[in-house]
Amino acid sequence: MSDSETEETTKQSTEPVDNAWSLKIPTFKAEDNPHGMVEESSFATLFPKYREKYLKEVWPLVQQTVAEHHLRAELDLIEGSMVVKTTRKTWDPYIIIKSRDMIKLMARSVPFEQAKRVLQDETGCDIIKIGNLVHKKEKFVKRRQRLIGPNGATLKSIELLTDCYVLVQGNTVAALGPYKGLQQVRDIVLETMNNVHPIYNIKALMIKRELMKDPQLANEDWSRFLPKFKNKNISKRKQPKSRKPKGEYTPFPPAQPESKIDKQLASGEYFLNKEQKQAKRQQERVAKQAEAAKKQDERRNKDFMPPTEDSPEQNRKRPSEASKVDVKALKAKLLKANKQK
């Protein structure tokens, strides 16, 4: 390659790009790293007990898949761990990271047929932790179910729009697919856990997909076409803290409150002996019980008390004020009517 061609290639690679997603990542080949890896690298991850049976069945396929990339995989059923290691023939330095992501996905209940896709260059994965985003357990379960939807319809629509495989499992959401789709999945999941229904983001993705097809709207602002979410939960205004009015300033400290002994000295109870104190308490208790019994009897006898009747004088019909006739006003009205005739 001549110097002019090298300069032209460098110039093209440093120019600003309108759409970074359209750029193609250059492939890494075995010729680029002929000497292989200097030292062995390994990654291990634990898996739950219920995944042991499935992993034991598919492990020969896992070993066969990683062997194509010159890696070695080990399954330890006693410790409950999966390990991937590089070999002397490994030439791709990033494939060990990809294989680590694969065993992480398999530990989180992603099937092997989907997890092995992460070994491809244009495919990545994202494990979104949602367990600590909502404090109350009931709200967390409700919002997580909202993400799945009835019969998994919402989750399926997210997968179709983002070209990603999405699995909701426990306190995490595992996503697998192209990097742009992973970014969209993370936004939808986080907003859903923040009490924004996923249907708003799904509608926005559908509208964006249609707008991309129109070349006239390629360089315009799309915000006027997208749905706007309005929060209907109006937060209550924080009430101002009520402050007690300060009293007049005095240089003297406040009076000491009376203690229990001071109250007993004032009432004379302090000088009584033990028997007298017990007798006084018993007397107060009896008086209190007698008062409570009296109130209870009054409440019971209330239903048997005869109602009060009005006296005969009160029952007489009194002429109402409305029945009185104003004679003067009536005469004036008649005279006015005669004059008009």
From Swiss-Prot:
Keyword Zinc part of the UniProt annotation: no
Family note: Belongs to the KRR1 family.
Gene Ontology CC: one annotated term: nucleolus
InterPro entries xrefs: KH_dom, KH_dom_type_1_sf, KRR1-like_KH1, KRR1-like_KH1_euk, KRR1-like_KH2, KRR1-like_KH2_euk, rRNA_assembly_KRR1
Protein's cellular compartments: Nucleus, Nucleolus
GO molecular function, a single term: RNA binding
Domain KH: 126-194
A biological process term (GO) from this entry: rRNA processing
Subunit record text: Monomer. Component of the ribosomal small subunit (SSU) processome.
Xref: Pfam families: KH_KRR1_1st (PF17903), KH_KRR1_2nd (PF21800)
Composition skew (Basic residues), residue ranges: 230-244
Protein name from the UniProt record: KRR1 small subunit processome component homolog
Compositionally biased residues, Basic and acidic residues: 272-303, 313-327
Region (Disordered): 230-327
Coiled coil: 271-341
Keyword annotations from UniProtKB, A to Z: Coiled coil, Developmental protein, Nucleus, Ribonucleoprotein, Ribosome biogenesis, RNA-binding, rRNA processing
Database matches in SUPFAM superfamilies: Eukaryotic type KH-domain (KH-domain type I)
Protein's UniProt keywords contain Nucleus: yes
Membrane spanning stretches: none
Function: Required for 40S ribosome biogenesis. Involved in nucleolar processing of pre-18S ribosomal RNA and ribosome assembly. Binds to RNA. Required for female germline development, cell viability during eye development and for survival of dividing cells and epithelial cells during early wing disk development.
